[in-house]
Amino acid sequence: ILDSFTLLTAELTAELTAELTARKKQYSYYRDTLIQKECKSEKVKLNTVCEIYDGTHQTPKYTNGGIPFVSVENIDDLYGTQKFISTEAYAKYKIKPRIGDVFMTRITAGIIGKCTVVERNDDLAYYVSLALLRPNADILDSKYLKYYLESVWGRRELSKWILWDATPTKINKDDIGRVLISVPPLDTQKRLVQVIEHFDVICTDLNIGLPGEIEARQKQYEYYRDLLLTFAETGSTLMT
């Protein structure tokens, strides 16, 4: 019985995991298809429509509280960082993040070009492994920039400048500015962002539900496994 239940749980978990992977691929395909339609627009160097900075090149002295400090490991959750620096250290930052800025991973063993749009005006210190992109709001929408750089088309452009032999891999700040990006009219960018975000919400809801289902199935398996083992050891009657 236990072997059969183990096999059933493993098969179900594999199916749910495959579904989660499929949803992520579906989102990426949909985003890339929408971006591709805009690749016919005029391409410009990123540094002509965007200011580009990077963070401190020195590992800071961390404090128990103060100003949140982020690096590539925080790209998915900027405000969840557990590292802080003093207000005195932060005062030395010449460029402080503000709403509409875009953080992009630029030095990492992971993915170069992963982005997050800054949505708060809270103080936030950042490391050299992150580039801070400040789009010209009259020309370039922040979220469009994020989606473009994360698309297959943006990654192709970034890959031309990535130093693949470096450890970890990186793209120099000045080379980020040489990346070509398609810039359709601003209203077109905003419409595209609206469509991608709508689809993103759908995929995110599914992605939240599927891992929860996998965890629930695992807990269910562990419960019945322990119950069966207890029954086998004691000869007790199984209770429901």
Predicted regions and their residues:
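Non-catalytic DNA-recognition/assembly elements of restriction-modification systems
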Residues: 33-56, 209, 213-219, 224
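Sequence-specific dsDNA recognition surfaces
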Residues: 47-59, 73-101
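A short glycine-rich beta-alpha junction/loop motif
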Residues: 124-131, 164-185
